[in-house]
Amino acid sequence: MAVGDAPLEKVALETYVPPAKPSLIGLSRAEISERLAAIGVAPAQRRMRVQQLWHWMYVRGAKTVGEMTNVSKDMRAELEKHVTVDRPEVVAEQISNDGTRKWLLRLPSGNTLEKPHEVECVYIPETDRGTLCVSSQVGCTLNCSFCHTGTQRLVRNLTAGEIVGQIMVARDRLNDWADRETPHGNRLVTNIVMMGMGEPLYNFDAVRDALLIVADNEGIGISKRRITLSTSGVVPNIVRTGEEIGVMLAISLHAVRDELRNELVPLNRKYPIAELMQACRDYPAASNAKRITFEYVMLKGVNDSLDDAKLLVKLLKGIHAKINLIPFNPWPGTRYECSDWEQIEKFSEYVFNAGYSSPVRTPRGRDILAACGQLKSETEKLSARERQALRAMAMTD
């Protein structure tokens, strides 16, 4: 199929079917109150009960209703008949040589006729922070040609509970809840990036609801300035992101000419660069203190020339921006190569001298296929030959 004929977006194969006993994870306070009303909790008690449940779920990380010891025994028994506080199940964990962790998570579902679906979630520890890369879809709506996830079919959108559940799983695995000890007394998951599997702005409502729960000061409590949502450029929902969520914004740009971006990010044929840049200028939360990050994967001989760097600087005029240069992370079957390090440095230096911060992202988790652009759920397993190719790539980098 020619590049110009490739579909801009994939259609989801399925819709979400909840388990017989749904989880309270991902519900708003109002929705939890409705669940309590449905099982007969008196109106005068609901507000207090909601706060108790919220605290146990998002501050103390309770895995069962039975752990909630300040909720009456009778109330716990009634709740356990109807709801859970389940999160996704960890079915595999890989730990990279650099400390990066990747979890393969199986999603609970009420659809017993289908194979359970899985997504990947990645934890990246650094000296001053711990970043969790979270998925928003099973597969991805888009067909970005340099991205491994883009080769996977779109199965369905994740629910708010499945998105929040990834953060809760990470805190479970790292023992990172408020009443538990962590090294040096610091929280281990300090930053969230919506840069995992999927296009977040094609699952706007669930992503919004999940991130508002994550940022809630009476629960998980991660500041909106430490949450970054990355989009390939779903222009109509960019301003909504600033107005309704208010988190940091990242744009997967990767090219400065429409002709090339049409190939790398086919969504560009629907929302071309000029429209995308205007949406960024209109982004409500942008300021010099809250700059928009432009992600730019460095592809050898494709988008890494100094002419590209010059055009990038022109495009960013009038936008509070920083540029994150990403060395291409190889995956089996890709036709792209990473730019030479010398060329990456030249590109970065030009952009920096033009007045924009332009750090080069350190690749993390390449050896476990956890780096940027490498995620692909185990529902589409790599063959033995592909795994051998991956190991060879990691050894040569």
Swiss-Prot record:
EC main class here is transferase
Which UniProt keywords are given for this protein, alphabetically ordered? 4Fe-4S, Cytoplasm, Disulfide bond, Iron, Iron-sulfur, Metal-binding, Methyltransferase, rRNA processing, S-adenosyl-L-methionine, Transferase, tRNA processing
Matches recorded under InterPro entries: Aldolase_TIM, Elp3/MiaA/NifB-like_rSAM, Methyltransferase_A, RlmN_N, RNA_MTrfase_RlmN, rRNA_lsu_MTrfase_RlmN/Cfr, rSAM
Q: What is its EC number?
A: 2.1.1.192
Output the Gene Ontology cellular-component terms: cytoplasm
Binding site residues for S-adenosyl-L-methionine: 198-199, 230, 252-254, 329
Active site (UniProt): 120 (proton acceptor), 372 (s-methylcysteine intermediate)
Q: Which SMART domains match?
A: Elp3
Q: Which cysteines are joined by disulfide bonds?
A: 133-372
Which of this chain's residues are annotated to bind [4Fe-4S] cluster?
Answer: 140, 144, 147
The cofactor binding remark recorded in the entry reads: Binds 1 [4Fe-4S] cluster. The cluster is coordinated with 3 cysteines and an exchangeable S-adenosyl-L-methionine.
**Major place of residence:** cytoplasm
Question: Does the record carry 4Fe-4S as a key word?
Answer: yes
Cofactors, names only: [4Fe-4S] cluster
Q: Which HAMAP family match?
A: RNA_methyltr_RlmN (MF_01849)
Its biological purpose: Specifically methylates position 2 of adenine 2503 in 23S rRNA and position 2 of adenine 37 in tRNAs. m2A2503 modification seems to play a crucial role in the proofreading step occurring at the peptidyl transferase center and thus would serve to optimize ribosomal fidelity.
The miscellaneous annotation reads: Reaction proceeds by a ping-pong mechanism involving intermediate methylation of a conserved cysteine residue.
Q: What is this protein called?
A: Dual-specificity RNA methyltransferase RlmN
Upper lineage: Bacteria, Pseudomonadati, Pseudomonadota, Alphaproteobacteria, Hyphomicrobiales
